[in-house]
Amino acid sequence: MATVASKQSQNSMLSNIWGWITTVDHKRIGILYGVTAFVMFLVAGIEAGIMRWQLSMPGLDVVSPDVYNQMFTMHGTTMVFFAIMPLNAAFFNYIIPLAIGARDVAFPRLNAFSYWTFLAAVLFMNFGFVVGAVPDGGWFAYAPLSEQPYSTNQGMEFWSIGLMLAAVSSAVAGLNFIVTIVNLRAPGMSLMRMPVFIWMSFVVQILLAFAIPVIAVGLIELTMDRLFGTVFFKPSAGGDPILWQHLFWIFGHPEVYILILPPMGIISDVLPAFSKKPLFGYPFIVFSGIAIGLMGWAVWSHHMFTVGLGPIAVSVFTITTMLIAVPTGVKIFNWIGTLWGGSIEYKTPMLFAVGFIAMFIIGGLSGVSHAVAPSDYQQQDTYYIIAHIHYVLFGGAILGIFSGIYFWFPKVTGKLLNEKLGKYHFWITFVGMNLTFFPMHYLGMNGMPRRIYTYATEYGWDNLNALSSFGYVILFIAMVIFIVNVITSLKSGEDAGHDPWNAPGLEWTIASPPPVYNFSDLPVVEGRDPYWIIKRRAIAEGKELPGPQALVDPSTVHLPDPSYWPAFTSLGLLIFATGFMIEIPVWFVKYPIAIVGGLLVFVGILAWSNEPITREKNH
Amino acid sequence: MAQIAESTGHHGAEEEHNCTGIDHRKLLMWVFLSTDCLFFGALISTYMVYRGQSLVGPYPVDIINIPITTISTFVLLCSSFAMVMALSNTNRDNLKGIRIWLAGTAIMGMIFIGFQIVEFTEFAMEGLLLSTNLFGTTFFTLTGFHGAHVSIGIVWLWVMFYQSFKGKVGSKTALNVELCGLYWHFVDIVWIVIFTLLYLVGGFDAGPPIVG
């Protein structure tokens, strides 16, 4: 009996795993994104911890200089491409269809393909750790340092090809969500009625779709230089490494907004919900988001002030960089205006949202200080820059993402995260991040360059470095508290109900966790903050507050069927990429495995396009 | 479509809800093509930045053959006409016309690729490889990626040609042909830009000016 039972549970576990592999449900894909990205967030955090350990005292020898190079390269790359971007993608996937009142994204299978390709990229790049060829050229991989003579192992190939996989994933996801937001909004949800999170996501998808091709070309050129002997970035043949910098930052600066706009959107949804009043200056926030999206294309050379582009280019990019601070400032004033006079409830999502505003202002101000080229000459490649990026990406993006996690966790799981642990989590994170990153401003001003693996005590950087490393320990504790909170809340958390925050969005009109079809009947939107309108009307008419949409039999709702072709195609792509790492000359073919992978991709796409979206049932 | 609506019961009716009325796939294709502009834009920019910067020959003026490529360009542009005819026949459910024009488009694309193979081989024999100089590097990369785009289009066209024998190509599914057409025309337009810049404008480039 026991063996039968265990076999059955094994079978159900297998079919459960198969269910996740073949899923095309945006909610499941969102969870996959979130979990994978959070694991990578921890991995990159541990890489940071190794660096902080090494720097905690002068002259330490925890890791060798080589390993240190690998740590800062992988920490930066992983945090940007495999943690913050996919954490944002988790919100896009889970929340966008719910918040615009749709049953799924426009292309559910393409969505699954995005996730599996992202996972392939994560595995591919981190495989370098297994074979001992870890990328070590820095997260922006400046040529010629990233080129063959200076980086002799396969590390940078793992980096560049891995990022190309991630690029495919993000670009495809971007296209998918553009179509979703344009076409699948519920009846009545005009563009100017969309929640700000949707607006910011929309801008981000456009940035993704248009910025990724540029980095793709850069990566292709770098990879071809390394594998096929082209001379794109080789000065000895007349090539210009500065071209790599341009290509990287033309993508790289929109990328900064790809990272920060979604958290800005999240807190624009969180602040009104906990201030109990509509977002102040909605159109200003929307249009400043669009302005940031446009102007983000005209500032890239501020990453290159010390390259020697000449006074005119430097002046122009100084001015555009200062201008882009204006729409960002507009947003901050509007957020504060939202708080003004509201009946504010300091629940955990709200704490993180307000923390975001405060920390982002610090990061924004240090940002303006290196928009000024002469001042930037002093700051370039120092810890001051490190301090800035961590105030905008940790103090900004990560705090915003945590705000979103606490806000939507009850919707995703049906359970509330523990408030008490949440508050500990927030305050310890807040103290920890300031202890870790604030001293870096002073270190930078005192001349400590980034990317050095140790320093002598005579420089006088000991105390501040020790403080920063101590801050890391506190951040680590905060993350442990968060993980404990998630696990215990999943097990025995308080039931959330469908609308725990009395929030305005459409996603709160349905049960938590949402049924597989999201909405049994598509909602009709009458204005901004649609659920508030419904609730207000019920109160005015003296009726009971409306409950969640009634559940129906899922088989009566037209939903796309699961499919394994997206995962299959991603696997083909992974084999294609791996093929370029293994040279097996067969006749005149140098990379036969890549050809096999390419054929698999072809088969996958063909089978995929021949597969009906919904099979005829009972026929 | 009718069958699907039937099987989905009372929740099927709103399934067709679409804010703009533009089919998802068509919108996707337009947005994709506009982003592909950035892809070719970056490759073309690389070529233009490195124009005349090669330190060693062969230079474009030595080997670029404008008359030959004019012929292949003409063939590729004609294929766009064939593509239009294929779509028009699809809309009219003229199966014979569909097959002729789909195959015609694909064959003209293959002629273009054939010219490209001959050109690449000739260049290689005259000593221009990917790694020879900046001209070789940028020229082969840009035209190679364009050729890859054309090749994907050719495969797509043949797949559709095959499907026409399975009764899957017709006015009800004309969007399939239309999407392929959008892609095909885009690749043609990109070639017009490449032909102008790499052959008509850049085809007479020599090495960098000798100073002193």
Residue ranges and their predicted role:
Chain A
Residues 2-619:
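Membrane-embedded and interfacial regions of multi-pass energy-transducing membrane proteins
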